[in-house]
Amino acid sequence: MRIKTILAGLSLLFVLSCVNQQNANKPVKTKIEKSHKRHLRKQLVSFIKGMRKGKPDEVKAYFDFPIKNDNFWYATLDYEKWEEYKGKGFGEKEFQIYFDAIFMGDFRETLGRINVNRLLKQGYDKAEYSYDSWNGGFKDILEVTYTDDKITMTFNTVVYSSGGGGEHIYVYVFTTKDGVLKFKDFQSTMVY
């Protein structure tokens, strides 16, 4: 009788250890990835909300100052002045002063139309914003892509009028390592 009890106990321990072993083989990263994605979602919503309001103080946490990127100077200063500032870091003070030149109202309006849930689930979302009048208008298109460690926002604005027009393209790149949103790069180009 005692041997049967011991064998039953050992069998139970064996079964429990197999169950624990199966659970140990499951990737733990899934919970971490979900946690990172939730955290990233909160940050994106906060970033977009701050952008929509045009509040540099609400989005500056996503930037490391001084920003080492001459394109910020190019987007904010006349060509002659831009040359003077090449190679100089773009500080928090300049970020406050030139915020509206770097992140124009049209960009902020279009960014507000991005669906964060769709972006994080599908890796892509697109929003458009346009205005037409009797003498011209504009059309803005913002395409946002999300990969494992990067969010790229490509903003294309086309301005047209009876006297001509032009096209501006701005690309903002953010890293998302470990679910933390941080600015990485900015590029711009203008075509007339």
Language-model-detected regions and their locations in the chain:
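Aromatic-acidic/polar surface patches that form glycan- and anion
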Residues: 8, 36, 40, 163
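Repetitive helical segments and hydrophobic/amphipathic motifs
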Residues: 11-13
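Short solvent-exposed beta->alpha transition segments
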Residues: 41, 62-137
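Exposed beta-sheet edge and beta->alpha loop/turn motif
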Residues: 104-192
